[in-house]
Amino acid sequence: MNTPKVNILHAPGQAAQLSRALISTCHTRPLLLAGSRVATSLHPTQTNLSSPSPRNFSTTSVTRLKDFFPAKETAYIRQTPPAWPHHGWTEEEMTSVVPEHRKPETVGDWLAWKLVRICRWATDIATGIRPEQQVDKHHPTTATSADKPLTEAQWLVRFIFLESIAGVPGMVAGMLRHLHSLRRLKRDNGWIETLLEESYNERMHLLTFMKMCEPGLLMKTLILGAQGVFFNAMFLSYLISPKITHRFVGYLEEEAVHTYTRCIREIEEGHLPKWSDEKFEIPEMAVRYWRMPEGKRTMKDLIHYIRADEAVHRGVNHTLSNLDQKEDPNPFVSDYKEGEGGRRPVNPALKPTGFERAEVIG
């Protein structure tokens, strides 16, 4: 039995050039992009049309990736459902999400914003984004057009790198607030659960993309280093100033919304033909987690769901940054009074700059 071929991609400095080669040729020649093995199958051959197509994209031989996290077979357990089931999104909610930026108002806001810009710069380098693929630097969080689009391979590398560290802030904040609650012998007023759920949701984004892309040694090394630095930085930052840290995460989620919005635009404009192909299948775990209906399971639909999640994190963290970090309850899980001016906050995905304290606490 022949071993299936897998396209190999790494070397971030040559990402754009090598990714172009991936699209323009029909060869299974090894390519390198940030240490990732990307499964690529766009048009199945005539002999394979009758068999189920794999969740990948290749133009020559059918490529299959090993399952990085197969379910462990046990004598009694059939499956383990998500600890936090996703509530799902309506199409109107998803299409209403737009990139937006909250202007810094304090020194802490300004510091958080500048740190995010540094992170964006480092991520662009790590994932091989070339100057001609950059958006307008005067409007980096809202501009979504560039002189040259990214390729599918570049997008997957970028998604995996971003999502591998995006799950860190919620876990760090939830852990520290949990320990703080134990030390003070006081309730946390609903913050911990929201923060941990955010971290869990980001991890599901990562696992979904890993079903389409196998990280190579270089990518794993970059992720290991980035996560180690980011975890410790978030840990110290949250101990010093939770308010600034939540603002930082809010700005970070603005970048995430911008990233996925640009990807959606490039799919719609036909720059990513493999993801526009009707035969392309998204991972089954994504269909189950987001409860995606029949007829709404394209790559574009998947990115819409993930972008809506990121928009929620954006609104939640900007709101939490506006609150009293020690005393205020979490407005997104609280029951509100009726008839006394109190009002439940609307979907945070639709409030890009977050709610001010007076709007949700009084």
Swiss-Prot record:
Q: Which Gene3D superfamilies match?
A: Alternative oxidase (1.20.1260.140)
Set out the biological process GO terms recorded for this chain's protein: alternative respiration
CDD domains with a match to the protein in the record: AOX
Specify whether Cell membrane is a keyword of the entry: no
Instruction: Please verify whether the record's keywords include Mitochondrion.
Output: yes
Q: What is its EC number?
A: 1.-.-.-
The UniProt entry lists membrane topology as:
Multi-pass membrane protein
Its biological purpose is as follows: Catalyzes cyanide-resistant oxygen consumption. May increase respiration when the cytochrome respiratory pathway is restricted, or in response to low temperatures.
Q: Which family does it belong to?
A: Belongs to the alternative oxidase family.
Q: Describe the subunit structure.
A: Homodimer; disulfide-linked.
| Protein name (Swiss-Prot/TrEMBL) | Alternative oxidase, mitochondrial
Gene name linked to the record: aod-1
